[in-house]
Amino acid sequence: MWVNLSCMCHIVDKLLELNLRRWNMRSTSIYVLASRWKKVVSDNTLIEGQRIRLWSFHSLAKLYIALVPLDPAPAPTLAILLAPAPTPSSPPVVTRDSDELYISHADAQEEGDRILPVHADNDWECLNLLAKVSEETTCLEVSQEANRRSSLVSDTELDLELRLSLPGKNSYVM
């Protein structure tokens, strides 16, 4: 069963609304990006061969998504520099291989926009983002959410803590 929903994606001082579909399964749910991914690619100057990890978290009843580059963008080769620019009729294409996203034919980014890279550490490399979540873990998360709501920390303070606790001072949140 597919259920449509949307989330807010904050990218370099821009707020995009992404359309997602949730596929309910027996013990877990899978979220699939339904549209507006091309806008994310073009606004961030993602290039072919660049490895990116996709993170998401919930806060204040909203779903947030962050793109974290795993390695610096490869230096362009002479063949790429001499290749003709892509035409508007060929939009960016995204393919999925394991837990890494490879981006092809990204448009050039405006000069005013900046993306600051996040350096990967050992904790990120061993994390399997595609691992299934057991029902026991899901119940634990629900109880943690209930405990958080009954704590003395306000939602605003907790949201600020979430933003400050993201790894690396050069990270960006969507």
From Swiss-Prot:
Q: Which GO terms describe its molecular function?
A: DNA binding
Enumerate the UniProt keywords alphabetically: DNA-binding, Nucleus, Transcription, Transcription regulation
Q: Does Nucleus appear among the keywords?
A: yes
According to the entry, DNA is bound by residues in 1-71
- Would I find Ion transport among this entry's keywords? no
Lineage, top-rank taxon, reads Eukaryota
Q: Which GO terms describe its cellular component?
A: nucleus
Its predominant location is: nucleus
Subcellular localization is given as: Nucleus
Protein name, entry field? B3 domain-containing protein At2g31862
